[in-house]
Amino acid sequence: MNLREKYHIPNDSVITIAGTVGVGKSTMTRALAQALDFKTSFEKVDTNPYLEKFYDDFERWSFHLQVYFLAERFKEQKKIFEYGGGFVQDRSIYEDTGIFAKMHFDKGTMSPTDYETYTNLFDAMVMTPYFPHPDLLIYLEGSFDEIISRIQERGRDMEKSTPISYWEEMYNRYTNWIDNFNACPILRINISDYDLMQEENPIEQIIEKVGRSLQHSRRYTRRELAR
């Protein structure tokens, strides 16, 4: 019996991994997908026509970049459900508006008109009963010091040259965002309790929690539909 069967995880489940930069989303995505025999869905950065322009001029390209991300994630989410589920997804569609677009608006690198247009578009496309929301959002969290340590350890040039103040702001924005998130069921995992980089095999403990969360959310959904 594999772990998916052992913990009664439906083979059409869609699980998305969320959390700030450096928290371990990609590692968790790969580990869960391998253990559950699910497919993975990763963000396609290399084909983004706005990313390089955006880094040269935030104010000019922030709206274009966010609309591009929204369209790509929407298409990916639709494809996952058309395929029949069985996916673990690295980063959710909800973070684009709740974290990144909001940050650009707050900092003045996205105009009020562009921000309103973007959020209206997001609400019309995503925040409806017709959008295929994930069955579960796993939110990875940890102390700020732990996350900074991970960012420094992986040694990406762009991240190493980014001021600590930026990562602290991002960390705080994520904390506020998840505390108010209710678009789909959430499972919060602390990276200090289940460190996939350090422990021999904590993945079964995580999958057990995933199974319980999915069973609870599906029972709740059935009760709501029966009303």
Roles of regions detected by a PLM:
Residues 1-13:
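Extreme N-terminal, non-catalytic leader segments
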Residues 5, 148-227:
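NTP-dependent small-molecule kinase module
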Residues 17:
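Hydrophobic anchor at the beta1->P-loop junction of P-loop NTPases
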Residues 20:
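P-loop (Walker A) phosphate-binding loop of NTP-binding proteins
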Residues 25:
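Conserved lysine of the Walker
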Residues 34-73, 99:
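Conserved substrate/cofactor phosphate-moiety recognition/catalytic segment
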Residues 99-173:
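A glycine- and Lys/Arg-enriched "phosphate-lid" helix/loop adjacent to the NTP-binding pocket
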